[in-house]
């Protein structure tokens, strides 16, 4: 579908250089064959991002940080947004799932078991970033829907703004993953 988006909308396709390397060198790891979506195909990116590169879209600058673990090319993103004259720092951790880090899965995919330590290192790499608003990979990861419902019930509140949530999120994910590994997964 990426190529179709580029054709329809004239957008640029962007991915980390590490992710692009995986698509070129190990396309089977992209898991497109398992997708029922007929548009799930490999694509050629227009831009391959390096760790720490800043991508500017309009008046928003996004710091792109390589945080491998879930996959070798995962990136996390950090940018600022404004509301009512205040600036908030937004953070998005690129790959919070463990499903690719089971010992058997890594061995079957011929990926190093050190990907598990790499995941933990990636979490620590971004833990101290100043983040006021956390965007989760999936709504359940940071109670996105409940926060939105609260905003509707209590106009004028914004539960998305929580300067402590980022470190809690990283610490909880770190603890959960350590338990996952201690359980022999």
What do these predicted ranges mean?
Residues 8, 129-130, 176:
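Structured helix-beta-strand junction loops
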Residues 11-12, 85-87, 185:
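Intrinsic structural disorder
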Residues 43-46, 54-56, 61-165:
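Metallo-beta-lactamase
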Residues 155-185:
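C-terminal regulatory/interaction regions
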